Amino acid sequence: MPPSVRYFFIVSVTTVIVFIVLYVLSFGGDQSYQKLNISDSVMLAQVCSSFIDGKSRFLWRNKLMIHEKPSCTEYVTQSHYITAPLSQEEVDFPLAYVMVIHHNFDTFARLFRAIFMPQNIYCVHVDEKATAEFKGAVEQLVSCFPNAFLASKMEPVVYGGISRLQADLNCIKDLSTSEVPWKYAINTCGQDFPLKTNKEIVQYLKGLKGKNLTPGVLPPAHAIGRTRYVHREHLSKELSYVIRTTALKPPPPHNLTIYFGSAYVALSREFANFVLRDPRAVDLLHWSKDTFSPDEHFWVTLNRIPGVPGSMPPNASWTGNLRAVKWMDMEAKHGGCHGHYVHGICIYGNGDLQWLINSQSLFANKFELNTYPLTVECLELRLRERTLNQSEIAIQPSWYF
């Protein structure tokens, strides 16, 4: 057998054996409290490395089980949560997270573990329309952490409606009364995942020097109708949506200039208090109740007002690296989606790993653990490795995957 053929045969056989081992590890036996031991972790690292290099196509499932946990203490330990601040810098700069979710519990649980730090605080808003099973699972998870809580008021969230913005604001209001001295609030959805460690996020936000991060511009042509016409939320058990009417809206209050931007932002505590109390913010919220996707104009419009705490100048544009998103209409720029599109946004597949790893953004959107498990697993492993490498304290054995 020629050497080149022999080499190809050996590589092929090895690949098949590794795949079988992975399959058995993934689906064999009771998966409650399944965790990566040393050999599993090494195996996953090798698989991820190969996949990023475009050499392998593996299926991997390392399910983080939340249900039927015997105790919070055991769950926190066996799920490898980090239970102590890793540096004084992070202690001195706690973060607040707003997490608005409605389904896909496993993906949310991975996000929560990835961003969890004991010095931070977490407000979780569960869609009022979510199933009882989902609500119960989230409540059970959150109850294990003294620095996490459910929003005091839950909204039945409608895609594109005011309820989505109101869900964020409900958490912002709850967080404003927290004794945790958080510096910035970051809003997320259940299909986000961090690309940077907590320390890296802290250092990035410290660099803003109190400025709020609300990427956005003056409305392009396709977005003008969102605030020009009256919109109505339609809410039912079968289908919820926003409809556009032919009625024109009055001008915005206080002669505000409306901007169009990202629904995902990083807000200083001072700005959060302004949003809750200042008449301009309160009136803009009321005016926005019958617009389309008000979360995409509310934050950026307020943050362009001169003199507002942490405001950015009108020409700030899309400044900031909050979210890595692959839009369907921008394939020429990002190279295409290797998963599939939903609402014009890529659900990341395994082939997107290299692009995600190269991104300078703090977070990426969107992920589905049950559809593309390896994508989340590889990012999670890489993030934990960097997190522990940056630690300035002794690392507990349970923090390793």
UniProtKB/Swiss-Prot annotation:
It catalyses: a beta-D-Gal-(1->4)-beta-D-GlcNAc-(1->3)-beta-D-Gal-(1->4)-beta-D-GlcNAc derivative + UDP-N-acetyl-alpha-D-glucosamine = a beta-D-Gal-(1->4)-beta-D-GlcNAc-(1->3)-[beta-D-GlcNAc-(1->6)]-beta-D-Gal-(1->4)-N-acetyl-beta-D-glucosaminyl derivative + UDP + H(+). One of its GO terms (molecular function) is N-acetyllactosaminide beta-1,6-N-acetylglucosaminyltransferase activity. It is found in: Golgi apparatus membrane. It is a single-pass type II membrane protein. Its main location: Golgi. Keywords: Glycoprotein, Glycosyltransferase, Golgi apparatus, Membrane, Signal-anchor, Transferase, Transmembrane, Transmembrane helix. Residues 29-401 are lumenal. InterPro entries: Glyco_trans_14. GO terms for biological process: positive regulation of cell population proliferation; positive regulation of epithelial to mesenchymal transition; positive regulation of ERK1 and ERK2 cascade; positive regulation of phosphatidylinositol 3-kinase/protein kinase B signal transduction; post-transcriptional regulation of gene expression; protein glycosylation; transforming growth factor beta receptor signaling pathway. GO terms for cellular component: Golgi membrane. Pfam families: Branch. Pathway: Protein modification; protein glycosylation. The chain crosses the membrane at residues 8-28. It comes from the Eukaryota. Residues 1-7 are cytoplasmic. Branching enzyme that converts linear into branched poly-N-acetyllactosaminoglycans. Introduces the blood group I antigen during embryonic development. It is closely associated with the development and maturation of erythroid cells. This is N-acetyllactosaminide beta-1,6-N-acetylglucosaminyl-transferase. It comes from Mus musculus (Mouse). The gene is Gcnt2.
